[in-house]
Amino acid sequence: MSEELSKKHTNRLNKLQKRLRREVGSAIADYNMIEDGDKIMCCLSGGKDSYAMLDILMNLQQRAPIQFEIIAVNLDQKQPGFPEHVLPAYLEKLNVPYHILEKDTYSIVKDKIPEGKTTCSLCSRLRRGTLYGFAQRIGATKIALGHHRDDIIETLFLNMFFGGKMKAMPPKLLSDDGANVVIRPLAYCREKDLEEYANLKEFPIIPCNLCGSQENLKRAAVKDMLNQWDRQYPGRIETIFTAMQNTAPSQGVDREQFDFVSLTRDPDAPMRGDVAEANLPAFDFLDIANSGRIDLDAAKRIDIVNTYEV
C-alpha cells in the first residue's frame, strides 16, 4: 500500500471509528444499556457486526467513567468446515477473556427442517437458549448482541408483512423469564458503516453457510426493498427509524396499546369560541404562528347566519 493510500485508509478509519463510537455511546446512554459493575457477555458469531461491537465496546471500556467487564463468547454450532481456530487466535491477540461453547445445533436443525426450507428461526432459538443459560452460569448481567439499525428496521417490516405485527428488535430487552437483559449497542449504527469498518480493520470474518441460499430468505427481500428506497429517496431509512422512536398509541388502532373503549368526551369541558372546533374547516383558520393549529379567536368572530334544529 502506497503512503498516499495508507493515509487515506487511516483517515477514513479514524472518521468512521469516531462516528460508530459516538452512535454506540448514544445508544448506551439513551437506553441505559451498561451500568457500573456490569459483566457484559459479548456474543461473537465471527461476522462483521459482532467483531465491530466487541472492538467498539473495548474502546469505550477504556474511556468510560464507569467500570464494566467484557467477556467474549462464541457458540460453535458444529457446522461442517467451521474454522475453529480463528476466533481463539483473534481473541487471544486482543487479550480479552473468552469462552468457546460447543453444541451441535447444526444436526438438530438439519434433522428438523426439510431441505430447502429456512433454518434461521430454529437455529436462532437453539442458539439463544444456549447463550441465555451460559450467561446465568457465568454471572453475566447483560448479554450484548450485534444487531444494528438495519436489522431493527428489517425486522419491523418482516413482522408487518409476514406476521401481522408492528414489532421490531428493541435496543434493550428483558428475557421472558426475567433472568437476562439483552442489549444491542449497535442499534444506531448503519450496516454499510459496519461493513466498511470491518473491511478497514480487516476482521477475520467467518461466513455463515448453514442457511444455504441466503438470497432466498424473506429478510434478504426486505433488505433489497429498503436499499432501493435508500437509493431513490435519501434519508427515508433515517426517517423510518426516527418514526419507530416516536410512536403515538392513541393515534393508532391497537386496542392493547391504548384504551379506546373507555374514551368519552368531557361534557364539562369549556368551549372555546361560539362555534365548536370540530365544525370548522381547519384550512380557513390556520394560525401559522401557532404550529398550524386552528385560530379560535378568528373562529369566534364568525357570524352564524342560519341554523336548523329538529
UniProtKB/Swiss-Prot annotation:
Entry-linked Pfam families: ATP_bind_3 (PF01171)
Cofactor stoichiometry and binding remark: Binds 1 [4Fe-4S] cluster per subunit. The cluster is chelated by three Cys residues, the fourth Fe has a free coordination site that may bind a sulfur atom transferred from the persulfide of IscS.
Key word Magnesium present: yes
Gene3D superfamilies in the cross-refs: HUPs
GO biological process: tRNA thio-modification
Miscellaneous information on this protein: The thiolation reaction likely consists of two steps: a first activation step by ATP to form an adenylated intermediate of the target base of tRNA, and a second nucleophilic substitution step of the sulfur (S) atom supplied by the hydrosulfide attached to the Fe-S cluster.
Quaternary context: Homodimer.
Function (record text): Catalyzes the ATP-dependent 2-thiolation of cytidine in position 32 of tRNA, to form 2-thiocytidine (s(2)C32). The sulfur atoms are provided by the cysteine/cysteine desulfurase (IscS) system.
Protein name: tRNA-cytidine(32) 2-sulfurtransferase
